[in-house]
Regions:
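Alpha-helical cap/lid subdomain in secreted, periplasmic
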Residues: 1-117, 121-132
Length: 134
């Protein structure tokens, strides 16, 4: 998630590109993140087969003065990265916690990017549920 935050400028880019060019640039941008992520999961899965991967949540960007213009485009980028998460989980036989189903209301966020104590409580409850099921 934080790696994606570092690339928000990509979404704010005012250069006119075709849809194909935008998608190609997004894939290129995500490639090193994907490689690092898969390497980390591979190494961890060799040490402990019980891993829980988490998707990236979308944030509460709509209506925020800094992020509002990229709120919907950021969902597409998050979805592209979450595809990497699900693909990696499938490859290494790990579970996935879908954070987009946890952080669903404005109250779940302390600010546009970070979870609030309410969101954090929901998150921790889901992790505990996963641990107790193992």
């Amino acid at each position: 998630g934080n790696d994606l935050l570092g690339h928000l400028g990509f979404l704010k880019n005012n250069i006119e590109l075709t849809a194909i060019e935008i998608l190609e640039q997004a894939v290129v941008l995500l490639a090193p993140i994907k490689d690092r992520y898969r390497t980390i999961v591979k190494n961890l899965s060799q040490q402990n087969p019980n891993l829980l991967l988490c998707t990236v949540y979308e944030g509460n960007l709509v209506g925020d003065s800094f992020y509002s213009d990229i709120a919907f485009a950021s969902k597409a980028m998050v979805s592209m990265f979450n595809d990497i998460v699900f693909n990696t989980a499938s490859t290494f036989k790990t579970d996935v916690l879908e954070l987009r189903n946890i952080f669903i209301s404005p109250e779940d966020y302390a600010n546009p990017i970070e979870p609030s104590h309410l969101g954090g409580k929901k998150y921790s409850q889901e992790i505990l549920r996963w641990v107790n099921d193992k």
